[in-house]
């Protein structure tokens, strides 16, 4: 197993290779190299990189007196869609799992909204499976010990099935739940 990690403080589990990167471009290159090197059971893109980057970052800290005008003049560019680009390049031989952190309206059927948003994202990227979860709600997602959401799996006929996770699962238990469903759903096999 290889982890390609951005700047995080998480320890690397024993027996796992780790490649540290700082930018989305470095992450793409490291993932592309790992996927090109041989047999891969699953490409799991479990965390997002930034959606945009500065074209020409400031070379120095901006003084308070000119900060607003300096920041207003910065040019932004959209980051490459790493999952979509890797699937386009390696998809036929590499099963893929994406994650989609979504914000939802306060009212309505949350699992149905996650299914709809997740399925659109999964199809757009060409992923075999995608876990959609809500962010911005206390107790789940970022900066929480628990999470919950909807796992979408695409079969060979392009039909999508979904399963809603149990509520507020510990993240390591949720990872096991997802892997179990990927195995039984035929996304990865042993």
Q: Where on the chain are the PLM-derived regions?
A:
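A cross-family phosphate/adenosyl-ligand binding-site feature
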Residues: 1-190
């Amino acid at each position: 197993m290889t982890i390609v990690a951005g700047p995080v403080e998480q320890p690397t589990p024993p027996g796992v290779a780790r490649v540290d990167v700082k930018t989305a471009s470095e992450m793409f290159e490291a993932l592309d190299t790992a996927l090109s090197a041989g047999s891969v059971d699953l490409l799991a893109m479990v965390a997002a990189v930034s959606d945009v980057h500065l074209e020409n970052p400031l070379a120095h800290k901006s003084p308070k007196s000119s900060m607003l005008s300096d920041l207003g003049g910065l040019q932004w560019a959209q980051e490459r869609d790493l999952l979509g680009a890797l699937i386009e390049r390696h998809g036929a031989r590499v099963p893929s799992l994406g994650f989609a952190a979504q914000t939802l309206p306060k009212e309505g059927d949350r699992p149905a909204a996650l299914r709809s948003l997740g399925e659109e994202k999964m199809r757009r990227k060409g992923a075999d499976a995608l876990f959609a979860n809500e962010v911005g709600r206390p107790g789940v997602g970022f900066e929480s010990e628990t999470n919950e959401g909807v796992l979408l799996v695409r079969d060979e006929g392009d039909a999508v099935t979904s399963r809603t996770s149990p509520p507020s699962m510990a993240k390591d238990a949720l990872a096991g739940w997802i892997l179990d469903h990927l195995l039984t759903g035929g996304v990865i096999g042993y």
